[in-house]
A protein has these predicted regions:
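Alpha-helix exit/C-cap motif
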Residues: 29-51
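Short, flexible N-terminal segments of the mature chain
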Residues: 43, 53-64, 115-118, 126
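Hydrophobic beta-strand residues in large extracellular and virion-surface proteins
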Residues: 27, 31, 81, 95-98
Length: 157
C-alpha cells in the first residue's frame, strides 16, 4: 500500500493537469472563434495604428457571454486575454496571451515568448495552483477582454 500511494498521487496530478489543459483549450477555441466572428462583422474598434482598442462595455459583455457559452465553462472560471499586433507573422485578431484560472489552478498561453523568455516560453505554461488570476502586467500588452466583462445582472442593449 505504501508503494501505491505515491503512484496514485502522480496519476491524480496528471489527470488534474489534463483537465485544466482541456478547459483552457476549450476557452482558447471559443475566444478565438468569437474574436474572429466579431472582427469579420466589424464589431472590434481599431485605433489609428491598426491595433485593437478595448471594446465598449456592451460589446465586451456580448463577447464575454458568447465565449462563456461556447466554451461551456462554469461562470466561476476566470480568464483574460490580449490580442497580438497584426503583422506578417500573425493575422489580425489573433490571441496573444490568454490566462485561465478555474478557481484551483492557473495556466497561461503565449503566442510568442514573454520576458524573460526562459520563465515565459511560447505555448502553454505549466499548470500551477492558484485561486485567481494575477494582475495583468503592462508588459503583456493591452488587456482586451476578461471574464468579468460578462455582467448578467446589468442591462446591455
Amino acid at each position: 500500500a505504501a508503494l501505491l500511494v505515491p503512484s496514485l498521487t502522480g496519476y491524480i496530478d496528471k489527470a488534474v493537469e489534463k483537465r485544466i489543459m482541456l478547459q483552457a483549450r476549450s476557452l482558447m477555441t471559443a475566444a478565438q472563434a468569437t474574436i474572429d466572428e466579431a472582427y469579420a462583422k466589424g464589431e472590434l474598434p481599431i485605433d489609428n495604428n491598426g491595433g485593437f482598442e478595448p471594446p465598449n462595455v456592451d460589446t465586451a459583455h456580448k463577447l464575454a457571454k458568447q465565449i462563456i457559452e461556447l466554451s461551456e465553462l462554469d461562470t466561476q472560471c476566470q480568464w483574460q486575454f490580449s490580442l497580438a499586433e497584426a503583422d506578417a507573422d500573425f493575422p489580425t485578431g489573433k490571441i496573444a496571451i490568454l490566462q485561465f484560472c478555474n478557481g484551483e489552478h492557473y495556466i497561461v498561453y503565449r503566442i510568442t515568448p514573454g520576458r524573460p523568455a526562459r520563465r515565459n516560453p511560447a505555448g502553454w505554461s505549466r499548470v500551477q495552483k492558484a485561486t485567481g488570476l494575477p494582475t495583468w502586467s503592462h508588459r503583456d500588452g493591452l488587456l482586451f477582454l476578461k471574464s468579468s466583462d460578462y455582467k448578467p445582472d446589468t442591462y446591455h442593449p
